From Swiss-Prot:
Protein name: Cytochrome c oxidase subunit 2
Protein residues bound to Cu cation A1: 161, 196, 200, 207
UniProt source species: Homo sapiens (Human)
A GO term for molecular function: cytochrome-c oxidase activity
Stretches of the chain found on the membrane's Mitochondrial intermembrane side: 1-14, 88-227
SUPFAM superfamilies: Cupredoxins, Cytochrome c oxidase subunit II-like, transmembrane region
Quaternary structure and interacting proteins, as annotated: Component of the cytochrome c oxidase (complex IV, CIV), a multisubunit enzyme composed of 14 subunits. The complex is composed of a catalytic core of 3 subunits MT-CO1, MT-CO2 and MT-CO3, encoded in the mitochondrial DNA, and 11 supernumerary subunits COX4I1 (or COX4I2), COX5A, COX5B, COX6A1 (or COX6A2), COX6B1 (or COX6B2), COX6C, COX7A2 (or COX7A1), COX7B, COX7C, COX8A and NDUFA4, which are encoded in the nuclear genome.
Implicated disorder: Mitochondrial complex IV deficiency: A disorder of the mitochondrial respiratory chain with heterogeneous clinical manifestations, ranging from isolated myopathy to severe multisystem disease affecting several tissues and organs. Features include hypertrophic cardiomyopathy, hepatomegaly and liver dysfunction, hypotonia, muscle weakness, exercise intolerance, developmental delay, delayed motor development and intellectual disability. Some affected individuals manifest a fatal hypertrophic cardiomyopathy resulting in neonatal death. A subset of patients manifest Leigh syndrome.
Residues given in the record as Mg(2+) binding sites: 198
Gene Ontology biological process terms in this record: ATP synthesis coupled electron transport; cellular respiration; lactation; mitochondrial electron transport, cytochrome c to oxygen; response to hypoxia
Cofactor note: Binds a dinuclear copper A center per subunit.
PROSITE patterns noted in UniProt: COX2, COX2_CUA, COX2_TM
Primary location recorded for the protein, binned into one broad class: mitochondrion
GO cellular component entries: membrane; mitochondrial inner membrane; mitochondrial matrix; mitochondrial membrane; mitochondrion; respiratory chain complex IV
Amino acid sequence: MAHAAQVGLQDATSPIMEELITFHDHALMIIFLICFLVLYALFLTLTTKLTNTNISDAQEMETVWTILPAIILVLIALPSLRILYMTDEVNDPSLTIKSIGHQWYWTYEYTDYGGLIFNSYMLPPLFLEPGDLRLLDVDNRVVLPIEAPIRMMITSQDVLHSWAVPTLGLKTDAIPGRLNQTTFTATRPGVYYGQCSEICGANHSFMPIVLELIPLKIFEMGPVFTL
């Protein structure tokens, strides 16, 4: 999860998030290089007093500043497209969970376990126990296994919402009348937090998401739901 004064992205808990962090560093390196070249050109312009008013054109320079940006865009676009297609892949999921957004809570349905349905509300401050996180903990967590592909089916019953868990690299819009899907495979156990990432009304900030990821062997013994 995020920490106060944190610089950078959250630690990755899925292969997709690992790819996103790598792409972030790749793009940031290119941006730093561009900024350095621009600042260097400005420095030379401000410090040199040599001028030449006889230059009418510069074909070589025009060729360079046309081709170079195109190469930079390709270097950014290709890895981005690769990750984009990876996020859309659905490869025989082991478990399917349906998430429905409401103002201002989430409903989850375990379609593979007899249609188990429950609501997940944010815990009010009066109900928080030592160790609970304000505005992030919920009354009913979503319990899922690690090391297994999981498909999330996401929709909304009223307005636009967005189901997002940063440490897993997930952010999928919940749209009324439309069923979106995303898949992920968690790589380590723990409790991971997310929030609604689409402004959805007065209590938009009070729609947390909590995933409790447990080892696959324990989950196969019988899903442990904190209801």
